């Protein structure tokens, strides 16, 4: 039996761009993608802390060190610039298998304030 566990989380990032007319979904600073142990085009769950909405989408890389957290296409209807969001990715594993979970805690300017390494 496989179970689904949290693999990566970016907590309290600020939305910097909303572009309904852009092809793509969640544009995320390439450096944040690496630090959070995510991959371009990986499926993610996004929770908008500001309005309570949740939606699934995928990651597209934004320029490294831009601190961009952009919602594009239909996802842009789910937030406004300045909203706080949580980005989560999951992995499937055997119950006795260990998964390294990475959690990035962000500050107001989308700089990494803290990195947590957990075992799932």
Swiss-Prot record:
InterPro entries attached to this UniProt entry: Asp_de-COase-like_dom_sf, Asp_decarbox
Pyruvic acid (Ser) sites (modified residues): 25
Pathway: Cofactor biosynthesis; (R)-pantothenate biosynthesis; beta-alanine from L-aspartate: step 1/1
Record gene name: panD
Any single GO BP term: alanine biosynthetic process
UniProt KW keywords: Autocatalytic cleavage, Cytoplasm, Decarboxylase, Lyase, Pantothenate biosynthesis, Pyruvate, Schiff base, Zymogen
Example of a GO cellular component annotation carried by this entry: cytosol
Binding site for substrate: 57, 73-75
Substrates-to-products reaction catalysed: L-aspartate + H(+) = beta-alanine + CO2
Family affiliation: Belongs to the PanD family.
An MF annotation (GO) of this entry: aspartate 1-decarboxylase activity
Subunit (UniProt): Heterooctamer of four alpha and four beta subunits.
Cofactor names: pyruvate
Cofactor binding note from Swiss-Prot or TrEMBL: Binds 1 pyruvoyl group covalently per subunit.
Primary role: Catalyzes the pyruvoyl-dependent decarboxylation of aspartate to produce beta-alanine.
Disulfide-linked positions: none
Subcellular location: Cytoplasm
Enzyme class name: lyase
Entry EC number(s): 4.1.1.11
Catalytic site: 25 (schiff-base intermediate with substrate), 58 (proton donor)
Protein name, UniProt field: Aspartate 1-decarboxylase
Pfam families (UniProt xref): Asp_decarbox (PF02261)
Post-translational modification: Is synthesized initially as an inactive proenzyme, which is activated by self-cleavage at a specific serine bond to produce a beta-subunit with a hydroxyl group at its C-terminus and an alpha-subunit with a pyruvoyl group at its N-terminus.
Gene3D superfamilies given in the database record: 2.40.40.20
